[in-house]
Curated annotation (Swiss-Prot):
Residue sites binding ATP per the record: 10-18, 33
Name of encoding gene: Cdkl2
Organism: Mus musculus (Mouse)
Cellular compartments annotated: Cytoplasm; Nucleus
Primary subcellular site in the record, as a coarse category: cytoplasm
Record-given protein name: Cyclin-dependent kinase-like 2
GO molecular function: ATP binding; cyclin-dependent protein serine/threonine kinase activity; protein serine kinase activity
Active-site residue numbers: 126 (proton acceptor)
Amino acid sequence: MEKYENLGLVGEGSYGMVMKCRNKDSGRIVAIKKFLESDDDKMVKKIAMREIKLLKQLRHENLVNLLEVCKKKKRWYLVFEFVDHTILDDLKLFPNGLDYQVVQKYLFQIINGIGFCHSHNIIHRDIKPENILVSQSGVVKLCDFGFARTLAAPGEVYTDYVATRWYRAPELLVGDVKYGKAVDIWAIGCLVIEMLMGQPLFPGESDIDQLHHIMTCLGNLIPRHQELFYKNPVFAGVRLPEVKDAEAEPLESRYPKLPEAVISLAKKCLHIDPDKRPFCADLLRHDFFQMDGFAERFSQELQLKIEKDARNNSLPKKSQNRKKEKDDALGEERKTLVVQDTNADPKIKDSKVFKVKGSKIDVEKMEKGSRASNANCLHDNGTNHKGLASTSLRDCSNVNIDHSRNPGTAIPPLTHNLSAVAPGINAGMGTIPGVQNYRVDEKTKKYCNPFVKPNQPPPAGIYNMNVSTSVSGEKYLLQANKKRKEYPKADVRLPELNYNHLPELRALEGIARNSRLIKKENKCLSESRIPSLAAIDLHVSSVASHQGAGSPLSDDSEADLPRMEHQH
């Protein structure tokens, strides 16, 4: 495993975690499933060995591709091709459901993948939105085969089955140990309604609640399942509700806006009797796929998507070429953030520029948001990065950054709340929720000047008056400081010295005059380095006022004064 560089955590569950990694030699991005220590937990070992065994014999364009298997320090590591987008992500972005054409393309590939497994006598047993990956080109891939297994031989029973309740067939809920491929067909019926409507079809909170949801829509269980229910000790003391035909709410009544072909397909998959549910090949021949020549047309389109994914996965070994191709694919959404150094020396013509690139995890979140904007086109145009999304510090803790290539200052990722940006947007079928424009925000902050008065003053009030007074006062101080700094030294004027102190000059007037001179001189002390004479003049004047009018200055005092030039 030393040849892989860990780029971050994708997700974790009860039996291990999935990490995004890069092959150091080829540069290929992969997903590595890291199981818990299998030697200490027999269940973990059983699930790991089952998934390894099945995926080694299953190779299909609609199944996730297992690349490598290794064991290190009692842990199993499974290396898969990396696909970070799921149908669950689409449902979160579009809570009112996906576009009809998108559901057609997704479901066609889902049934293809499940049919391939069934043809090898393998049932998945855990079909749900989060276990269905979608590549950048729109190719669907089933994943998480930890609960999958081969069909039981005659007389053999299944055990240890645990999967998501909302997609469980009735035979699983009542504890039937002789189920088959029909459990995956049931999950397909639940999935098609959820993809179109955005909400789960049967969101039960417990097994008995799940059965109640099913029976109120589809009617009573078959006699065999009713018998198994009452024999199951889990349901001891509980009775099944008896639903009359008039009380049932069928799919066409619950979802009157859905097309007839959708209702027909869903009802076939959700038949209460598992023996009457169709096979995958029968579903692909349904009107839902055959109308308007969709199946034939999309089969050709799908081959192009698969070839595109194959080209994207075969990355060059040279890191420079790989980086160039990645930057070209990102386009405008990954522009370099330019920060100008406003404290640079004004003598330099060009201001300093610092280039800071977003973190790897940010780019991935941006990629998901962009892929959502192209969901109606089924990602035909690839992915342009952005949006949003929030990044945890834990995701970034394992990221190895090459500082020699990126010497710029690292900016921590920001967490944005999309619901606060566009709270009223209805992300229905094919609509896209609002995405915040970060450049607009940066532009607003950059040109926001707190000292510029608005064109129309706010209504008069005590708070507005205080704010305006403070702003105007600060503006005046800024202008005054600027004038003082720009005041030339050659224009500094010294107070005039009176060598002839007239005898009729009164003492009080002399003191007042010299006080004004001191104040004026103190203002000029910070701007001029020329020594001040005001203090000497004050001393002489005070002596003159005490000695009486007409007392001339002594020769020694005049000798201490610097020679001044008088302008007439």
